[in-house]
Regions:
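Catalytic cores of nucleotide-sugar-dependent glycosyltransferases that transfer UDP/GDP/TDP-activated
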Residues: 1-488
Length: 488
């Protein structure tokens, strides 16, 4: 099966979040299942050409693409995804992609991704490569299914091509003015109140993708159900409800070549499910780095997160004094809204022997926090999938999470499971989005930590689970087949 995997970020070239990890890992697993995959990505100026060995594609040469009535010149560069034979095609248009960041608030943000989508299709035409499925990701590629079914329907190359849209976060929808009709050359009869592309008087790229993709999925089962409700659907629950039979949830996988405490190149000490002694050595190393005195009887709670409202830091702030009165130590890594950054800076200044904070992002430190922490906190308001709780399971850092999205699909509350006679709990969770519920779950974890035999059982329950990409890729293959059946 031939798959065109279209994404606006991909490890190791360009990354702002989890989408880059998906794009860098899933295609390789699909190849192992017999798929022929090509990846399509914008060539941002932030991508180092010489470092990655990008080569200009003379086979494709210059492509003139009309956006907003203006012809833009597009070129393509190619590369092989590291450790694979997968071709990566970089859409090069300096006018749109040579910016200071991957996503911008510039007034032509819509044009950037209209051009990207059209250029992907025209690259496929130049290659004369007819994919069975075009796999789109998030709003930036949301117009692709419409383009294939309408704007480019004259080309028999795409007669049997199906489309799949993966929603990584419904909160980001690509909502622009109706001038997009002209800019993208979309038929005017598609734009009307409540129509397939209209949202709040404008045009939503995400809604267009939901309306025209053959199959839709999101990145966990629970999130797929949640986005059908007003609480989580962000205004798109009605159109999602119409497509409910075509909506699926597939949990993201993780790359255990990178995230494994037995082999992790970022750790000073390695350890395994059979010998956890190295975990405390990492904890000691981490705490010493922040000038905090290690104590094996005091739990260390780690946080690695964007410091934004979605991640639950408002309810964290509500109970700050109660949390700091618990007999626990804290290491926090992240950046985001000023008020939350300031909150954690202030904490580490006021409680230097208890709280360590690093504002920014540090990849090595993120690995060390997973390895050194006894617990890992994710009190998210909503979480489409979440990866850090899965890393935490592997590293024996017991997750404390709000029961939402992918967190609900991966974390089983120890006390809840115990109540029903099961011994497979791997963390602690809470339902109610409140400071009180958050506090009680952390308090429970801190109390259970005193019982070393029980704690080790919770750790090993998590460490033995398998969330590798292999299982996820098999499920995507099933969805590709479903999409093709629908297209026929």
């Amino acid at each position: 099966m031939k798959i065109a995997f279209v994404s606006t970020e991909c490890v190791p070239y360009a990354k702002t979040g989890g989408l880059a990890d998906v794009a860098g890992s899933l295609p390789s697993e699909l190849v192992k299942l017999g798929c022929d995959v090509k990846i399509f990505l914008p060539k941002y100026s932030l991508i180092d050409e010489s470092q990655h060995g990008l080569k200009y594609s003379w086979d494709i040469s210059e492509m003139p693409i009309r956006i907003n009535g203006v012809i833009r010149s597009v070129h393509v560069h190619v590369n092989k995804l590291p450790h694979s034979n997968i071709g990566v095609y970089f859409i090069d248009c300096p006018h749109y992609f040579y910016r200071h960041r991957i996503y911008t608030n510039d007034p032509d943000e819509d044009e950037r991704f209209i051009l990207f989508s059209k250029a992907v299709i025209e690259t496929l035409q130049r290659l004369q490569w007819a994919p069975d499925v075009v796999h789109c990701n998030d709003w930036q590629t949301g117009l692709l299914p419409l383009f294939i079914k309408d704007n480019y329907s004259w080309d028999k190359l795409f007669d049997n091509t199906a489309t799949l849209l993966t929603i990584h976060n419904i909160g980001y929808q690509g909502l622009f003015s109706k001038s997009v009709l002209f800019g993208a050359e979309i038929q005017k009869n598609l734009f009307y109140p409540g129509g397939p592309i209209e949202q709040d008087g404008g045009i939503s790229f995400m809604k267009s993708g939901i309306s025209f993709a053959d199959i839709i999925n999101t990145v966990s089962n629970t999130y797929a159900h949640e986005i059908l409700t007003p609480e989580y659907g962000a205004g798109l629950e009605a159109v999602l409800k119409q497509r409910e039979d075509d909506l699926f949830g597939i949990l993201n996988g993780v790359d255990y070549n990178i995230w494994d405490p037995e082999t992790d190149k970022h750790l000073p000490y390695h350890y395994s499910i059979n010998d956890l002694s190295g975990k405390y050595l990492n904890k000691r190393y981490l705490l010493n780095h922040f000038g905090i005195k290690p104590d094996e009887n005091i739990p260390l709670i780690g946080i690695v997160s964007r410091m934004v409202l979605q991640k639950g830091f408002d309810i964290f702030a509500d109970i700050l004094s109660d949390l700091m009165s618990l007999d626990a130590q804290w290491i926090i890594l992240g950046s985001g809204e000023d008020k939350f950054e300031d909150l954690f800076r202030r904490l580490s200044n006021q409680l230097p022997g208890k709280v360590g904070t690093y504002i920014g992002y540090n990849n090595e430190l993120s690995h060390l926090i997973e390895a050194g922490s006894d617990m890992f906190l994710m009190p998210s308001r909503y979480e489409p999938c979440g990866l850090n709780q899965i890393y935490s399971l592997k590293y024996g850092a017991v997750p404390i999470v709000r029961k939402t999205g992918g967190l609900a699909d991966t974390i089983k509350d120890w006390d809840e499971q115990n109540h029903f006679g099961f011994k497979d709990g791997n963390g602690f969770s809470f339902y109610d989005y409140s400071g009180f519920a958050l506090y009680k779950s952390i308090e429970r974890a801190v109390n259970v930590f005193k019982h070393k035999d029980i704690w080790k059982k919770i750790q090993t329950n998590g460490m033995k689970l398998d969330f590798s990409w292999t299982r996820s890729a098999e499920k995507y293959l099933e969805l590709y087949k479903l999409a093709l059946e629908k297209r026929q």
